[in-house]
Amino acid sequence: MTRMKQLLISISLLLLFVACSKEHDNNDGPLTKGRRTVIVYMSGRNTLSRFTNSDFQELVNGGSKIPSNDRLVVFLSRISDKEKQAIIRVTGDKKQPVDTLYKYQDSFYTSEPDNFVEVIKRTMTLCPADEYALVLWGHGSGWTVEKDTRRAYGIDNGNKESNYDMYGLWLNLPDMRKCFEELGVKWKYIFCDCCNMMGAEVAYELRNHA
């Protein structure tokens, strides 16, 4: 029953994209400046990939509550041979609930620091605003004293699902802090929809960036 439910959700979401989405040419310019852009960074090329569709659908369902001068933008990365990594705006419009702003032609590790920065910079360029907020979606191991690879977020196993404790590339929290320093943005807030990432140690590591 669970597999059937997941299949139905996947089919429904695919139909939603085909029937009710607008896809921009990657050369299209940015949107007009808004009040706030919330960026949801979904690092789903791991054991959480099966949940990306349903969680994204929840964002779409709540899109009608987004104020007209705010933007909710999702970077969606999941295990798929067909669906490319993309930056997608949730519009709140019933006729066109999602708007694909940019689709990457070549796959990449979302937890590589340079790629993390590039995605966020591109999203901020496409959806300029007076202020920005960030939601991190994916696996997290928080901040421990074991080794850097465990003070981390968003493991990426490439385009395959495997045991996230053994394989894949993490974005270490010290590296994430350096990414934020490079971006030079003071987030309105940083929300972590992942394990072990809402502790005081994580907040202290990122204290100067929100």
Can you say where each PLM-predicted feature lies in the sequence?
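Short, Lys/Arg-enriched N-terminal segments with co-localized hydrophobic residues
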Residues: 1-3
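Sec-dependent signal peptide recognition
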Residues: 5-11
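Short, surface-exposed polybasic-aromatic patches that bind anionic ligands, especially phosphate groups
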Residues: 14
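C-terminal motif of bacterial Sec signal peptides marking the signal peptidase cleavage site
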Residues: 17-19
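N-terminal extension/subdomain marker
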Residues: 21-130
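Extracytoplasmic/secreted cell-surface and envelope-processing proteins
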Residues: 47-52, 82-84, 142-147, 197-202
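Surface-exposed loop and adjacent secondary-structure segments within mature catalytic domains
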Residues: 75-104, 131, 135-170
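Catalytic cores of nucleophile-dependent amide-cleaving enzymes
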Residues: 135-144, 151-210
